[in-house]
């Protein structure tokens, strides 16, 4: 059963705004206006809302855990990409410093060219 907030407002006692005194006893109501059946229904509604909030809390915890796992994976991927980029830049800088021109083909590529001719 899904709790209906409008029903809870109807069942609640006089509000602090309407009492104007701010006295806690008047704001919450004395309970004399309600019979036992309405109080039991209110407790059942409270238990229902409490159960619903517990299930929402569990779902949010699971989502938060997945979010944390994804964040960790993304940070690892980012770090890996930074390392790869840095090594490629160092390799390109080394090639430029050594030859100044286009790099020589890899030995495997050179042997394949020789086999074709």
From Swiss-Prot:
<feature type="coiled-coil region">
    <location>
        <begin position="50"/>
        <end position="92"/>
    </location>
</feature>
<comment type="similarity">
    <text>Belongs to the UPF0184 (EST00098) family.</text>
</comment>
<dbReference type="Pfam" id="PF03670">
    <property type="entry name" value="UPF0184"/>
</dbReference>
<feature type="compositionally biased region" description="Low complexity">
    <location>
        <begin position="12"/>
        <end position="22"/>
    </location>
</feature>
<dbReference type="InterPro" id="IPR005374">
    <property type="entry name" value="BBLN_eukaryota"/>
</dbReference>
<feature type="region of interest" description="Disordered">
    <location>
        <begin position="1"/>
        <end position="39"/>
    </location>
</feature>
<keyword id="KW-0175">Coiled coil</keyword>
<protein>
    <recommendedName>
        <fullName>UPF0184 protein AAEL002161</fullName>
    </recommendedName>
</protein>
<feature type="region of interest" description="Disordered">
    <location>
        <begin position="83"/>
        <end position="117"/>
    </location>
</feature>
């Amino acid at each position: 059963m899904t709790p209906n907030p409008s029903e809870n407002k109807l069942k609640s006692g006089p509000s602090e705004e309407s009492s104007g005194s701010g006295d806690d006893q008047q704001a919450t109501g004395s309970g004399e206006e309600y019979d036992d059946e309405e109080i039991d229904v209110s407790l059942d509604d409270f238990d229902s809302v409490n159960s619903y909030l517990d299930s929402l809390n569990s779902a949010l915890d699971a989502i938060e855990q997945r979010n944390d796992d994804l964040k960790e994976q993304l940070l690892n991927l980012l770090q890996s990409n930074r390392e790869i980029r840095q090594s490629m830049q160092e390799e390109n800088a080394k090639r430029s410093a050594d030859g100044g021109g286009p790099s020589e083909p890899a030995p495997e590529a050179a042997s394949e060219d020789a086999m074709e001719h």
